[in-house]
Amino acid sequence: MRLISLLIIVPLVYSCKKDQPEPIPIDISLSSGLVVLCEGLFQQNNATLSWINTGTGGISNDLFEEKTGRHLGDTGNDLKKYGGKVYIVVTLSSTIEVMDATTFAPLKQIEMLNGTVAKQPRSIAFYGSKAYVTCYDGFVDVIDTSSLNVVQRIPVGSNPEGLYIANNKLYVSNSG
């Protein structure tokens, strides 16, 4: 009886294996899918940028790391496309990541520091050739979208959060 049990159990155990799902090839282009920014957990440095191909259902759960070889950072808060570029605002890392909107190739990491103090950028809006970024240090930083350099700082009060541009005016909401 013991031999029969072994003859049944041994082949069953060795025939079991985990199936590895075939990766679904994904065509990465803004016209064929969605980009999703996941904020990540506070102070865990695990924000991600995912890609969902709406035609095939293919998903890339960390497109940013695939394209750059590094983590996006801590607390991704805003994502906008403007002028052929994608801008990702990462608050606690105090960076703005700029990528090509077609290929998602990295173009520049803009460090948002005042000396060595983190500005903690929050939101971004665009007008003309400028990007406007709220920073928790009480300013809106103006970035030239060609050079990708900060060209001006505008004082706006405590903890600016959102911003909106209409009729040649910049509106900023403060939370402090």
Segments and roles (model prediction):
Residues 1-7:
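Sec-dependent signal peptide recognition
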Residues 12-15:
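C-terminal motif of bacterial Sec signal peptides marking the signal peptidase cleavage site
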Residues 17-176:
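Predominantly soluble domains enriched in secretory-pathway, periplasmic, or organellar proteins
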